[in-house]
Design a protein with these regions (language model features):
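Divalent metal-dependent catalytic cores for phosphoryl transfer on phosphate-bearing substrates
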Residues: 14-15, 42-141
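Charged phosphate-binding loop/patch that engages nucleotide di/tri-phosphates or the phosphate backbone
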Residues: 147-178
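Short, well-structured alpha-helical segments
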Residues: 23, 27-30, 49-53, 82, ...
């Protein structure tokens, strides 16, 4: 399945039953992802921007089947989301982000998958040192620079994204229906 514009994947989510709350969530994660994308572009890191954007939109698709996981911790949505997207004809590499965004510690993940996972943490102001270190390590390798040189730049950037977490959370409050 190919998408002609950014609204197409949102429409697919709605067509398969995504609630307004889930749509708002992926849009807020998308805001964090766009900030990360800009930071990586400023470092001249070459990666698949469209994949990241699609991954962000689809990463929690399984919460359509497990709506309680929109408000409670849980991971049943991960495999369910991947299967649901595959059934809709979504590229398997993109559908995989339903699992990799939550299982990045135990899966071999691409840079793009790690960016989706990181955006899913930072959107709400939550930092994750292990995940950030994985992203920085891959970024340093990709742009052929020293880890610590990249760390200094990206750590500040990650903090900037996280600093907007309270505002993004406040914008999700009105979407209480599952």
């Amino acid at each position: 399945m190919t998408f002609q514009c950014i609204q197409d994947p949102y429409q697919l989510l709605q067509d398969i039953g995504a609630s307004p709350r889930l749509i708002q969530h992926v849009k807020l994660v998308g805001e964090a992802a766009e900030m990360l994308i800009l930071q990586f572009q400023n470092l001249s890191i070459s990666f698949d921007l469209d994949w990241v954007r699609l991954g962000v939109i689809f990463h929690d698709a399984g919460k359509i089947l497990h709506p309680s996981e929109l408000i409670e911790k849980g991971n049943e949505h991960e495999a369910a989301g991947e299967m649901m997207l595959l059934a809709q004809g979504v590229d398997p590499l993109i559908a995989r982000c339903c699992r990799s965004h939550g299982q990045w510690q135990t899966m071999e993940c691409s840079f793009e998958e790690l960016v989706v996972a990181l955006a899913d943490h930072l959107w709400k102001g939550k930092r994750n040192t292990d995940l950030e270190n994985k992203v920085i390590t891959k970024a340093a390798t990709m742009c052929h620079q020293d880890y610590w040189d990249i760390f200094v730049v990206l750590d500040g950037g990650f903090e900037e994204v996280a600093a907007g977490g309270d505002l993004r959370i406040s914008r999700s409050v009105g979407f209480n229906n599952l």
